[in-house]
UniProtKB/Swiss-Prot annotation:
This is Uracil phosphoribosyltransferase homolog. Highly expressed in leukocytes, liver, spleen and thymus, with lower expression in brain, lung and skeletal muscle. The modification Phosphoserine is found at residue 25. It is found in: Cytoplasm; Nucleus. Residues 1-38 are annotated as: Disordered. The keyword Phosphoprotein applies. It comes from Homo sapiens (Human). The gene is UPRT. Its main location: cytoplasm. 5-phospho-alpha-D-ribose 1-diphosphate binds at residues 186, 238-246. GTP binds at residues 133, 142, 176-179, 203, 232. Residues 13-26 have a biased composition (Polar residues). Signal peptide: none annotated.
Amino acid sequence: MATELQCPDSMPCHNQQVNSASTPSPEQLRPGDLILDHAGGNRASRAKVILLTGYAHSSLPAELDSGACGGSSLNSEGNSGSGDSSSYDAPAGNSFLEDCELSRQIGAQLKLLPMNDQIRELQTIIRDKTASRGDFMFSADRLIRLVVEEGLNQLPYKECMVTTPTGYKYEGVKFEKGNCGVSIMRSGEAMEQGLRDCCRSIRIGKILIQSDEETQRAKVYYAKFPPDIYRRKVLLMYPILSTGNTVIEAVKVLIEHGVQPSVIILLSLFSTPHGAKSIIQEFPEITILTTEVHPVAPTHFGQKYFGTD
């Protein structure tokens, strides 16, 4: 099961103890820290998601600089083809309590895969600039498969009865009909095979969003969906969430085709805090499923996956 972000009901005073041996003391907390308790009781299954809302642009890692990210255009080929590629400046001046309040608002919508060493290794290889393209693609496909599997777990099932080869009646479940996938080109297409490996007959639509050369605003260049998409639940595939702008435009197009945000599940590998917040603030009913929330997004994903780096 995916894990929801949670914040404490209130911040402890400087002279109060936190009633958990695994929770950092108030002195150890930094503005913007969110404590995430994954499913499982052992120490290895616990992780901290750091929302670095106090960083100014000048103190961000070099990877967040617009030059390092390859420019500020949305979904441009020059910036890894990951689409959501405008440079990310973490908002400054927000307090921890403000982040907690926001996390309460999005807690049920932002879901994280439970962290373990396997997922952590895959994330590490994907972020490693020295990784070969073969290792990168292998690790990316594995991580995509894990995200897709959990995404399918968010879809509705219904009970059914089957008969085994020995004549035994077995009570099980099966998918309710009416699901589809939509990939945001180009990087979202990397996730299509993972979805087809799990659902051989699922229908997949596509949408292409790029920045306008004159206005630099996101513009929809192509959209093709199943004709009855308004009756389906949608797995929206986009591996890297940086600013969230591309996904916001894609959801607007889906809404124009009759899709309700409440039936959209966004499948992502990596997200920045700003990207997740922007999407949820725009569409509070959408569900975001990702493996990591981190201020540095691996925006090279699309270029390296498709061999255009």
